Design a protein with these regions (language model features):
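Hydrophobic, well-ordered beta-alpha structural blocks that scaffold small-molecule cofactor pockets
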Residues: 1-50
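Adenosine-phosphate binding glycine-rich loop
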Residues: 6, 118-155
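Residue-level detector of alpha-helix initiation sites
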Residues: 18-20, 84-85, 132
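Hydrophobic beta-strand scaffold residues
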Residues: 35, 57, 100-101
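Short acidic/histidine-rich motifs immediately flanking catalytic phosphotransfer sites
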Residues: 53, 71-76
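Conserved SAM-binding strand-loop segment of SAM-dependent methyltransferases
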Residues: 55-61
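Short amphipathic alpha-helix with an adjacent loop that forms part of the alpha/beta core around
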Residues: 63-73
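ADP-ribose/adenylate-binding Rossmann-like module
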Residues: 76-81, 87-114
C-alpha cells in the first residue's frame, strides 16, 4: 500500500548527518514539517540548511537511542547513521514511543519504505515501490517512466 503522508507542522527527526540523512532531508523540505537533525558530524549541505533556518541541528554523539526520551512528540523518526546496531535501537525506541520509524540501512525493519516519486508540475504524482527490496531498480523505472509521462502530458 502506498500512502502519501501529510507532514505539515509535524515533527520529524533525522538521526545521522551524512549523505543518507541529507538525502532524506532533501525529500522532506517541501513538506513544511519541523525537521530536527541529531548527529555529531554534519555535511556542508546540512550546515547551510541550518543557517537558512530550515532545520534544527542537535550536535551530539550517540551511543544509544536514549536521546529520544527528550523528543517524545516526533511523528516520524529516520535512523540514518553509519551504525546498523544503533539504527535498530533507534527504530525500536521510536516505535515504542508511537512514532513512524525508518532505518536507512534496513527498510524491511522499518514501518514504511521510501518510494521513487515522479511529480509532474503538480498535475500528476506517481510512486514506484519495490517494497524496499531494490531502490536501484525503482530509480531506473522512475527515470524511464518519467520521460514517457512528460511526453504524454506535454502534448
Amino acid at each position: 500500500m502506498i500512502v502519501d503522508l501529510n507532514l505539515v507542522d509535524k515533527h520529524v527527526m533525522v538521526i545521522g548527518g551524512g549523505s543518507e540523512g541529507a538525502r532524506k532531508i532533501r525529500g522532506l523540505l517541501g513538506q513544511n514539517c519541523k525537521i530536527t537533525v541529531i548527529s555529531n558530524r554534519l555535511n556542508r549541505y546540512l550546515k547551510s540548511l541550518e543557517k537558512q533556518g530550515k532545520i534544527e541541528i542537535v550536535k551530539t554523539k550517540l551511543n544509544d537511542a536514549s536521546i529520544l526520551d527528550s523528543y517524545k512528540n516526533q511523528f516520524l523518526i529516520l535512523a540514518a547513521t553509519n551504525n546498523k546496531t544503533l539504527n535498530r535501537k533507534i527504530v525500536e525506541k521510536g516505535r515504542s514511543m508511537g512514532s513512524f520509524v525508518y532505518a536507512a540501512d534496513d527498510p524491511q525493519f522499518s514501518d514504511f519504505s521510501y518510494t521513487s516519486i515522479i511529480n509532474i508540475e503538480g498535475i500528476l504524482q506517481v510512486a514506484i515501490s519495490t517494497y524496499g527490496k531494490s531502490p536501484i531498480m525503482a530509480r531506473k523505472i522512475r527515470i524511464k517512466l518519467e520521460r514517457i509521462l512528460y511526453r504524454i502530458i506535454k502534448k
